Every structure is written in C-alpha cells, then in structure tokens.
Amino acid sequence: MDRFVSTYTMRLDAKGRVSIPAPFRTVLAKDGADGLYCHPSLAEPALDAGGNRLVGEIDALIESYPPYSEAREELAAALYGTSETLRIDPEGRVVLSDTLKAHAAITDQVAFVGLGHKFRIWEPERLKAHLAEATQRVRELRQAIGSRAENPRSTKA
C-alpha cells in the first residue's frame, strides 16, 4: 500500500499556488483521487489532506455513530463542513483558500508532512515547534515503555 512519507517545504508562487510534492502526487494518482481533499486539522494549527483513502476513513468514522446523533452531526460539521476539494492543475499545483491558509497561518511557504494515509500541511516554523514537542513526547514514551520492559509486573499470586 502506498503511503505519504517524508517532509517537503515548498513556496507559494505569486498567484498563491503551491506544488504538491511529486511523491505525494504519485500516491494520490494511485488512489484514484481527482483532486486534493483538504480540511483544517482538528488537533493542530495545520491542514489535513489526502485522497479517496482519507475520505473513506472520514466516512467510516462518521458512519460509526448513529444517524442524527449529536456526535455524528458534530463530526460531520467539523470534517465535511470545513473541507474543500482542491483542483490539482497539470503542473501538480493547488490553490489554498484564504480560510485554509488562515487556519494554518500560511503565508509564503508550506511544509508537507507525510503521515501514512494522509499528509499534513503546516506553516514551516509551526511545524518545527510541533516536531520538537512531538520528539520530546516520543522520548518520554520510549522511556516509559523501556521501564516497563525492564521491570515487568510480577505474576506471582
């Protein structure tokens, strides 16, 4: 299965277009996506983006809640209601709307970060800060896991 991997920093051109990294375009093409599905991240000051696989995962998440339930309505509004399908031009560029750019504080550069089934679009300095925090949390998690592996709980009765 093809995945979005690696990080790429790209510059917006004078018309506000940005090129999707070629490896990401390849994954989108294999996914059969005819555009780029993009919405403000629910967790970060960034944008979540992807193709049909991402849309399918969102559909499954929303459909896991009972019809007309409050949770389903809120998820649908948060994910479908704020999403945009961006047209990819023949050169592999998209135009981010002002709403999307405002959510992620994007001005002249963006960083594309592969997350496997989707990718995230960040303002590069915000990404740098996020990665520093995430790396620290992963180190702490690794230490906690290592401590448990070294000192397994006793199984004696």
Curated annotation (Swiss-Prot):
One of its GO terms (cellular component) is cytoplasm. Residues 7-52, 83-126 form the SpoVT-AbrB domain. SUPFAM superfamilies: AbrB/MazE/MraZ-like. It is found in: Cytoplasm, Nucleoid. One of its GO terms (molecular function) is DNA-binding transcription factor activity. It holds the Pfam family MraZ. Belongs to the MraZ family. This is Transcriptional regulator MraZ. It comes from Xanthobacter autotrophicus (strain ATCC BAA-1158 / Py2).
